[in-house]
Amino acid sequence: MAKKSKIVAQKKREKLVAQYAERRAELKAIMKCPTASLDERMEASRKLSRLPRDSSPVRLRNRDQVDGRPRGYVGKAGVSRARFREMAHRGELPGITKSSW
C-alpha cells in the first residue's frame, strides 16, 4: 500500500494536468510553429515555464487503482502485477487465464 500522501499528491497532479492541458498545448504549438517570430516563441516559452510544475503530464506516475502501488503497473488492467495475479486467480479479469502447456 502506497502512502496516502503520495496518492493524494498524484490526484492533485492529475487535476492540474487536466486544468492546464489546453493552455500547455497552445503554448507548445506556438513554440513549434515555424512561422512564429523568435520573440513570440520566447514569450510562449516564458509563459510555459511560469505554469505550475505539476501541470506537466510527464510528472504523472501510473499507479495501481486499488492501493496506489507505483511499481509493476499493468496498463491494460490498471493495477500492479501482484494485484493482477491475485485478480486473475480469482477470475475477476475476464479473458485472462493461467497458461498451461
UniProtKB/Swiss-Prot annotation:
One of its GO terms (cellular component) is small ribosomal subunit. Keywords: Ribonucleoprotein, Ribosomal protein, RNA-binding, rRNA-binding. GO terms for molecular function: rRNA binding; structural constituent of ribosome. Residues 44-74 are annotated as: Disordered. One of its GO terms (biological process) is translation. Residues 61-70 have a biased composition (Basic and acidic residues). Part of the 30S ribosomal subunit. Contacts proteins S3 and S10. Belongs to the universal ribosomal protein uS14 family. Binds 16S rRNA, required for the assembly of 30S particles and may also be responsible for determining the conformation of the 16S rRNA at the A site. This is Small ribosomal subunit protein uS14.
